C-alpha cells in the first residue's frame, strides 16, 4: 500500500491537526504536521478544547506529561471529536508508570473512542490489565508475543493499535502487520532482543 495518495490528500486539504502533546515532543509533532501539509495547533487550555477540536481534521492526545487540566482537556477534545466523527489518535505514554496515570487513561478511554492507539509492549500490557513493566515511558518487558498484545488491545479497544518495538506492529483486531515504522534497530539490538 502506498502512502502517496493519503499524503496528497493531506497536502490538498491542509487540515487542522489539534495536538494535546507533551512538552518533550510538542515542537517535533508540530514540525512533522507541517512537513506533511497539515496545520498544527497545540492548544492545551480545557476552556477552548471543544471549540478547537470541532475545527480539527484530527485530534492527537498524548499523555507524556499529564496533569488534571490536560486530562480534562483530552476528555473534552476527544469527546467533541467523536461526536463530529473526527479521528482521534491516543498515545498513552507511560500508562503503567503510576496508578494515577493508569486510572486517568482508563477514564479517558471510557469517554473517548480512539481511531488509533500507539503503544509499546509495556503500555499495551498495562491497558490489558497484565501489569506491564515500565521505566518511565520505556517498556522494560519483552513479551514473547507482542503480536498477541497488539491484537488483544485492538480487539478490546475497537481500534487500530500501533505497537512499537524492535519490530513495529499494526493490528486492527482482525489483521496484523509487522513492519519498521520508525525504529531501526542496530544488529546489537536484534541480538539482545533474541536473548
Predicted regions and their residues:
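Single conserved hydrophobic/aromatic residue that forms the stacking wall/gate
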Residues: 182-195
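Anion (oxyanion) recognition and catalysis
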Residues: 34, 82, 155
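Glycine-rich phosphate/adenosyl-contacting loop at the front of the ribokinase-like
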Residues: 1-42
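Conserved phosphate/ATP/ADP-binding segment of small-molecule kinases
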Residues: 99-176
Amino acid at each position: 500500500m502506498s502512502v502517496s495518495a493519503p499524503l496528497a490528500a493531506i497536502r490538498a486539504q491542509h487540515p487542522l491537526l489539534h495536538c494535546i502533546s507533551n512538552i518533550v515532543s510538542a515542537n517535533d509533532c508540530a514540525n512533522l504536521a507541517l512537513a506533511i501539509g497539515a496545520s498544527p495547533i497545540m492548544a492545551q487550555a480545557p476552556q477552548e478544547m471543544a471549540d478547537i477540536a470541532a475545527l480539527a481534521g484530527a485530534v492527537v492526545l498524548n499523555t507524556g506529561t499529564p496533569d488534571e487540566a490536560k486530562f480534562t482537556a483530552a476528555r473534552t477534545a476527544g469527546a467533541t471529536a467523536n461526536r463530529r466523527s473526527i479521528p482521534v489518535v491516543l498515545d498513552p505514554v507511560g500508562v503503567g508508570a503510576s496508578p494515577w496515570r493508569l486510572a486517568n487513561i482508563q477514564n479517558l478511554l471510557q469517554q473517548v473512542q480512539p481511531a488509533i492507539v500507539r503503544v509499546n509492549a509495556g503500555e499495551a500490557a498495562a491497558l490489558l490489565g497484565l501489569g506491564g513493566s515500565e521505566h518511565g515511558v520505556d517498556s522494560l518487558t519483552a513479551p514473547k508475543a507482542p503480536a498477541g498484545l497488539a491484537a488483544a488491545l485492538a480487539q478490546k479497544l475497537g481500534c487500530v493499535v500501533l505497537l512499537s518495538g524492535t519490530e513495529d506492529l499494526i493490528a486492527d483486531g482482525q489483521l496484523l502487520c509487522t513492519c519498521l515504522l520508525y525504529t531501526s534497530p542496530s544488529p546489537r539490538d536484534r541480538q539482545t532482543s533474541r536473548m
